[in-house]
A protein has these predicted regions:
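A short glycine-rich, Lys/Arg-flanked "PGG" loop and its adjoining helix->strand segment in the class I
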Residues: 117-132
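A short acidic, Gly/Pro-enriched loop at the edge of an enzyme's catalytic core
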Residues: 92-103
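Conserved class I S-adenosyl-L-methionine
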Residues: 1-39, 52-56, 73-76, 80, 132-171
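Short alpha-helix
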Residues: 183-206
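Class I SAM-dependent methyltransferase SAM/SAH-binding core
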Residues: 44-46, 50-93
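Acceptor-substrate binding/catalytic loop of class I
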Residues: 141-145, 176-190
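A short SAM/SAH-binding and catalytic strip from SAM-dependent methyltransferases
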Residues: 103-116
């Protein structure tokens, strides 16, 4: 279901992701890169989309192999970056030999993978002993609720189910001439961390980053995201 959605949204997503300072990535990705270890031999990005995370990792010295389930997104990623390898494949069945990477990165992609648990297990398979998995997801609390308004002090209301099995979410947004439909799977914390535990990972670090004060000074509605976490990030190591 998720793969078909992103195939349809590929062009819209490329326009959205590539407009500088347009979406949350520009505010939150520095927190994520602070979690990522220094480059070693090979880094795998799973769910690379149009490739912006891989390009940013390359600028930080990583040698990247990136995969995505969408043909269109892989084509866009290749067009923007001839220095790395981009492959279309299922994250739940990676075409790599065991213990062939030092680092696996999932930036806002675990919730887009139909079989999240198998994707985590596959990441463990292709990582060397002591290899690291770094991930960012929409925070499970943010997925379960909404702010009542755009005001900085707006109440946050949980109006969906947090506990239990995964649930499908979708949101349509039009802003500054760009249109995007976001959709994927929402999990509770136990869903993500249970998958890591069963795959043999130990969590080293967890972050719930907040926007900084200069961001709030430019847009007072961002104060909402200093009270409720928008994203959850972690670093885990393969035993």
């Amino acid at each position: 279901m998720s793969r078909e959605h992103w195939e349809r949204q590929a062009s819209n997503w490329a326009d959205w992701a590539r407009r500088p300072d347009f979406d949350a990535y520009w505010k939150y990705s520095p927190h994520f890169f602070d979690l990522v270890p220094h480059p070693r031999d090979r880094t795998l990005e799973v769910g690379c989309g149009e490739g912006r995370v891989s390009r940013d990792l390359t600028r930080r010295g990583h040698r990247i192999v990136a995969v995505d389930a969408s043909d269109h997104l892989i084509h866009l990623a290749k067009d923007a970056d001839q220095n790395n390898s981009y492959l279309r494949c299922d994250a739940a069945c990676l075409p790599f030999v065991d213990e062939s990477f030092d680092l696996a990165v999932f930036y806002n992609s675990l919730m887009d993978i139909d079989d999240m648990e198998s994707a985590v297990r596959e990441a463990a398979r292709v990582l060397r002993p002591g290899g690291v998995l770094c991930a960012c997801v929409t925070h499970p609390i943010a997925d379960a609720g909404r702010f009542e308004s755009g005001e900085g002090d707006s109440p946050f209301v949980i109006d969906d189910t947090y506990l239990g099995d995964r649930r499908w979410f979708a949101a349509e947004i039009e802003r500054d001439g760009l249109h995007m439909i976001f959709a994927g799977w929402a999990y509770p914390l136990e869903g993500y961390f249970g998958a890591l535990e069963r795959a043999g990972f130990a969590i080293q670090a967890v972050r719930e980053p907040r926007v900084d004060q200069p961001t709030v000074a430019r847009n007072s509605s961002e104060e909402r995201w200093r009270r409720i976490p928008n994203f959850l990030m972690w670093r885990a190591v393969k035993a």
